[in-house]
């Protein structure tokens, strides 16, 4: 039976928007799915506008006919598809689509190769369950772009889909932190990998290469089972530091602190032992080293191993910070050839190409290792 569409013409109430699009990663009692859509199209019909935007409301129920995604597909097929040559569809959704809806979206996109779809979701629904993780991967594999809503998209929805009475969008305090956690989690689920050029440029340990102002952190997690460290493949990925932004992320957040947020978010069992290994393009600054040491003291079931490509020495106190980590029982070392290769094989979208070391990689690694040991032994203050 063809689902009856409900196309909400009236803009969303502000309280409805804040309640349903609040991006706290774990939320209950949100049983309504809101789908704000925009369709940019090329058409031979001059009476049709080039941009159509509106809202569908659906339910998180066992009957997928009542899901907002199904309403949209039915509406689009009946109203726009016959007149469209090319269409760019964007969904801003409060929850990501279920496996059934993903299958229907995949069929739709396969039937209409000139239609593209971007799904930007405020939250991830049941992302720890295998079926829902598989649904997200399948959605991405259909060619749809899947992403987490960022500050600009929340503001865009506020401006275009909410009866805001000309009031500006006021983000909740935890929006940036929640966004970062969800973005990294989605990267884990979709098994995102780093671009090869990005890896080589940011992880090179050649001191003559300048301009690496960002910090990348690759991580993997193992837990101790019967005396053996067993990989937790669902917790493996890479993190980029959140740059400071006067609007969306005023304070910024270093990659190490994003990792601590993520470990807390995983809710690892206190009765088990875990080992987190991170390969980072810059060693931690003093402030991050202090916070990492405090975190490990509060979470004795977690061990952290740090291997850095370069020593971050642009701020005072970096030596003290490295020694603080060492005293906290965190092994810290400089990356060697084997670790660069491991990162290339594990975290980089290398398309089957082997790791090609840059000139004097081993020499730079040895020099940096000697410098790190001198710091940890408190030589030269």
From Swiss-Prot:
Keywords: Antiviral defense, Cytoplasm, Hydrolase, Immunity, Innate immunity, Metal-binding, Nucleus, Phosphoprotein, Repeat, Zinc
Site entry: Interaction with DNA: 241
GO molecular function: cytidine deaminase activity; RNA binding; zinc ion binding
Region (Interaction with DNA): 210-212, 310-317
The enzyme's E.C. designation: 3.5.4.38
Catalytic residues identified in the record: 256
UniProt cofactor(s): Zn(2+)
Modified residues annotated as Phosphothreonine in this record: 32
Xref: InterPro entries: APOBEC/CMP_deaminase_Zn-bd (IPR016192), APOBEC_Cyt_Deaminase (IPR050610), CMP_dCMP_dom (IPR002125), Cytidine_deaminase-like (IPR016193)
Residue numbers spanned by region Essential for cytoplasmic localization: 1-62
All residue ranges annotated as the CMP/dCMP-type deaminase domain in the record: 29-143, 211-325
Ligand binding (Zn(2+) 2): 254, 285, 288
GO biological process: cytidine deamination; cytidine to uridine editing; defense response to virus; DNA cytosine deamination; innate immune response; negative regulation of single stranded viral RNA replication via double stranded DNA intermediate; transposable element silencing
CDD domains with a match to the protein in the record: cytidine_deaminase (cd01283)
Chemical reaction(s) catalysed: a 2'-deoxycytidine in single-stranded DNA + H2O + H(+) = a 2'-deoxyuridine in single-stranded DNA + NH4(+)
Region of interest (Necessary for homooligomerization), residue spans: 206-333
Binding site for Zn(2+) 1: 67, 98, 101
Enzyme class label: hydrolase
GO CC field: cytoplasm; nucleus; P-body; ribonucleoprotein complex
Complexes and interactors: Homodimer. Homooligomer. Can bind RNA to form ribonucleoprotein complexes of high-molecular-mass (HMM) or low-molecular-mass (LMM). HMM is inactive and heterogeneous in protein composition because of binding nonselectively to cellular RNAs, which in turn are associated with variety of cellular proteins. The LMM form which is enzymatically active has few or no RNAs associated. Its ability to form homooligomer is distinct from its ability to assemble into HMM. Interacts with APOBEC3B, APOBEC3F, MOV10, AGO2, EIF4E, EIF4ENIF1, DCP2 and DDX6 in an RNA-dependent manner.
Family the UniProt entry places it in: Belongs to the cytidine and deoxycytidylate deaminase family.
Swiss-Prot/TrEMBL domain comment: The CMP/dCMP deaminase domain 1 mediates RNA binding, RNA-dependent oligomerization and virion incorporation whereas the CMP/dCMP deaminase domain 2 confers deoxycytidine deaminase activity and substrate sequence specificity.
Name of the protein in its database record: DNA dC->dU-editing enzyme APOBEC-3G
Gene source species: Lagothrix lagotricha (Brown woolly monkey)
């Amino acid at each position: 039976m063809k689902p009856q569409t409900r196309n909400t013409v009236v803009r969303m109430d502000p309280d409805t928007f804040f309640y349903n699009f609040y991006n706290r990663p774990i939320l209950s009692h949100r049983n309504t799915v809101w789908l704000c859509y925009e369709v940019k199209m090329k058409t031979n019909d001059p009476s049709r506008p080039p941009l159509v935007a509106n809202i569908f409301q659906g339910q998180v129920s066992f009957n997928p006919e009542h899901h907002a995604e199904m309403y949209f597909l039915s509406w689009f097929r009946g109203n726009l598809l016959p007149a469209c040559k090319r269409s760019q569809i964007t969904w801003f959704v409060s929850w990501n689509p279920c496996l059934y809806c993903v299958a229907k979206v995949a069929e739709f996109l396969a039937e209409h190769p000139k239609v593209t779809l971007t799904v930007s979701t405020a939250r991830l629904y049941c992302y720890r369950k295998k079926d829902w993780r598989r649904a997200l991967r399948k959605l991405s594999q259909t060619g749809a772009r899947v992403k987490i809503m960022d500050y600009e998209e929340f503001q865009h929805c506020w401006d275009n889909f909410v009866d805001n009475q000309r009031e500006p969008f006021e983000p909740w305090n935890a929006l940036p932190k929640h966004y970062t956690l969800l973005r990294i989690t989605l990267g884990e689920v979709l098994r995102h990998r780093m671009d090869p050029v990005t890896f080589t440029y940011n992880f090179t340990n050649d001191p003559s290469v300048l301009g690496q102002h960002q910090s990348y952190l690759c991580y993997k997690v193992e837990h101790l089972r019967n005396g053996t460290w067993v990989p937790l493949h669902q917790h493996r990925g890479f993190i980029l530091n959140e740059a400071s932004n006067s609007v969306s992320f005023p304070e910024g957040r270093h990659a190490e602190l994003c990792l601590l947020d993520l470990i807390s978010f995983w809710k690892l069992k206190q009765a088990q032992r875990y080992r987190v290994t991170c390969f980072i393009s810059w060693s931690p600054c003093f402030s991050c080293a202090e916070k990492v040491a405090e975190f490990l003291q509060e979470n004795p079931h977690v061990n952290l191993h740090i291997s850095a490509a370069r020593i971050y020495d642009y701020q005072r106190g970096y030596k003290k910070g490295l020694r603080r980590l060492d005293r906290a029982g965190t092994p810290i070392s400089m990356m060697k050839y084997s670790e660069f290769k491991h990162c290339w094989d594990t975290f980089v979208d290398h398309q089957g190409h082997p790791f090609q070391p840059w000139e004097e990689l081993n020499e730079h690694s040895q020099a940096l290792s000697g410098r790190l040991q001198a710091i940890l032994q408190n030589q030269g203050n």
